[in-house]
Curated annotation (Swiss-Prot):
Its cofactor is Zn(2+). This is Probable phosphatase Athe_0620. It is an enzyme of class 3 (hydrolase). Zn(2+) 1 binds at H8, H10, E74, D192. Belongs to the PHP family. Its EC number is 3.1.3.-. One of its GO terms (cellular component) is cytosol. GO terms for molecular function: phosphoric ester hydrolase activity; zinc ion binding. It comes from Caldicellulosiruptor bescii (strain ATCC BAA-1888 / DSM 6725 / KCTC 15123 / Z-1320). Keywords: Hydrolase, Metal-binding, Zinc.
Length: 240
């Protein structure tokens, strides 16, 4: 299965990634993608950019070298109520917002704490996707989170990078994938690229999706059209 839209990648603005925005877009073009979401880390991530960066992303052209560019963010969840580190005035100007738990932004708590945090983020109308929920550092009630995503029509990310950098993520991701299939919940397949060579790299995620016969119509970034249709569910009217 080939993905047409990269939904999760970082530029040098995140502070610990290694290419600029244009380099990431050009790499997406080389790999035959049709769209890319630039999702730099929110300001609570040490070394990342300020909220002004996200507010001003609107100056980035919608297309660069024929590739659709979606203005996004990987917001940090900063408390167990699911609050994030991006102000509303910036969120309103973004196309696609991922919310994630990161250990440098919020300590690990209980399963109940983590579950409440993710569900709180899911309820935020400006958030479209939950990032790497398979992280074993933040164990969750997976069924509760998946059911909340279904209720609010949000996507759950199956993060390919997790299989390399977050030990024991695979078992959690498989369980989440099965639950999303069971309940008809959207997923996004993201590389979480911090270097241009990893753009569109979702080989393990794609293998699991095929192995567990996940419905293609629930993969939001399977095609450019499916991604834009998903965004329209959340009030984003973007023309191809």
């Amino acid at each position: 299965m080939f993905l047409e839209v990269e939904t999760h990648c970082h530029t040098i603005a995140s502070g610990h990634a290694y290419n600029n925005l244009e380099e990431m877009v050009l790499e997406a073009q080389k790999k035959g993608l049709k769209g890319i979401c630039i999702t730099d880390h929110g300001p609570e991530m040490p070394g990342s950019c300020s909220s002004l960066y996200f507010y001003n992303l609107i100056v980035v052209p919608r297309k660069i070298n024929g590739i659709m560019v979606f203005r996004g963010c990987e917001a940090n969840i900063v408390d167990y109520e699911g609050r994030i580190d991006i102000p509303e005035d910036a969120l309103k100007r973004l196309d696609f917002v991922i919310a994630s738990l990161h250990d440098v932004c919020i300590p690990s708590g209980t399963v109940s704490d983590h579950t409440r945090a993710l569900i709180g983020a899911i309820k935020n109308p400006y958030i479209h996707c939950i990032g790497h929920p398979g992280n074993p550092l933040y164990e969750i009630d997976k069924e509760e989170v998946v059911l909340a995503a279904k209720e609010y029509k949000k996507a759950i990310e199956i993060n390919n990078s997790s299989f390399y950098v977050r030990e024991k993520s695979k078992e959690n991701c498989i369980e989440i994938l099965k639950l999303c299939k069971k309940y008809g919940v959207y997923i996004a397949m993201g590389s979480d690229a911090h270097y241009k060579a990893d753009i569109g790299r979702c080989e393990i995620t794609q293998k699991l999706v095929c192995e567990y016969e996940f419905p293609p119509e629930l993969i939001v970034n399977k095609s450019l059209e499916s991604f834009i249709s998903f965004l329209k569910l959340h009030g984003k009217d973007i023309d191809i």
